[in-house]
Amino acid sequence: GYICLNYDTEAVDGENLSVPTSLEDVTGPEWRGKVALPSPVSSSPGRGFMLASLDYFDWQSDDGLKFSDWWSSMVANDVVITSGWTEAYETHYTGGYGEWTEGYIGDAHITVSYCHSPGVESYYNGNWTKSASLDIPKTSFFQVEYASAVSGGNALYAQKFIEYLISPEVNSMM
């Protein structure tokens, strides 16, 4: 699915923060230390968001902020870079279900997640969520996830596992 920025609507309202309408907005002082991004090195949503930021800033555009300038501004603005999606969403993000998990820190009101994460939050939380997707043009990335049996000595079990992954039983839980 699509990867995008998600934000905590209650925190934004409660702290009187402006809802970002551009990537430049989250480099401002009101968002200092309140953004958690999964590392593009170890996280596929992190990689997807990094690619979206490349597109957003037109890679090496001569007019205005460059992609690398934005990332440097985020570092200077105390962005929390995590080891992966789980740490960003469950440990740092205030708008998700992480607040009910062990190790929760809750210091970030914006994170990278799937654009459908707020819907999933609502589904499992009695049709209510405080999380929303940010609709900032050119900041989303479509990620395809797949499974494959490429080589090895257990082709039969690999095939059975893939059949299980695509079964109605598994997909009804997603």
Region locations from a protein language model:
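Ligand-binding pocket segment of bilobal, Venus flytrap-like solute-binding proteins
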Residues: 52-134
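Residues that flank catalytic or metal-binding motifs in active/ligand-binding sites
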Residues: 1, 31, 49, 107, ...
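A conserved helix-loop-strand patch within extracytoplasmic ligand-binding domains
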Residues: 1-41
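Non-transmembrane alpha-helical segments in soluble domains
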Residues: 24-27, 50-54, 71, 159-166, ...
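A bilobed periplasmic-binding-protein/Venus flytrap-type ligand-binding module shared by bacterial periplasmic
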Residues: 6-11, 54-55, 143-157, 173-174
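Periplasmic-binding protein-like
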Residues: 33-42, 164-174
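Structural recognition of the beta-strand scaffold that forms the well-ordered cores
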Residues: 3-6, 34-38, 109-114, 133-135, ...
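Short beta-strand->loop
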Residues: 24-27, 109, 123-141, 150-152
